[in-house]
Amino acid sequence: ISTTSFFPAKPLGCYGDGGAVFTDNDEWASIINSLKVHGKGSFKYDNVRIGMNSRLDTLQAAILQVKFRAFIDYELTDINKAAVEYTERLKGIVKTPIIPDGFYSSWAQYTIKLKDKEQRDELQTYLKEQGIPAMVYYPNPMHLQTAYKDLGYQKGDFPITEKLCNCVLSLPMHPYITTAEIEKVIDTIAKYLKG
């Protein structure tokens, strides 16, 4: 089973909210289809489980159909070229994402790893002062979020996750980013860190 989000900021986003679930298991597909339509059973007005209204509306589906063509035709290639530019120019300055040979990414974010939270936060502030947006998307690890409190996890149970939440920063990234924009981001990071 796999999922994807069609949130507008995602690489393949619609103009509203949306997502998809993929499976090659017929039983799971049946349950997922039921859950997305209020928990519907085999009879339209018999809800056999608690579900939700999460069908993708036809307008969003039409938008995605057009965007999917652009995504396949050039956006995926362009965003991977941008990632290569970032990675090559940031070598030796910060830790960059690693994509194994034979794979590629759709790059929802290009996230760098810094020394610690203090350095990350200071760099983010400096980039903002220079007119460069940089984001911390996941400041709190999942195991420490309120929704999972009943699982009994404590701070320190997942030290790598906790460290990453404190030291990663996402840089501007989209298929239409220019080499000049990437160079400005990299030069600004290098200037700050080599300060």
Predicted segments with their positions:
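Conserved active-site segment immediately N-terminal to the catalytic lysine
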Residues: 1-13, 43-46
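Short beta-strand-to-turn element immediately C-terminal to the catalytic PLP-Schiff-base lysine
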Residues: 5, 19-24
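Alpha-helical hydrophobic/aromatic positions enriched in membrane-embedded helices and signal peptides
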Residues: 9, 16-17, 49, 164
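Short glycine-enriched loop/turn motifs at secondary-structure junctions
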Residues: 12-16, 104-106
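Adenylate-forming
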Residues: 14-18, 62-64
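Short, glycine/charged-enriched secondary-structure capping and boundary segments
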Residues: 17-19, 185-186
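PLP-dependent aminotransferase class I/II
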Residues: 24-195
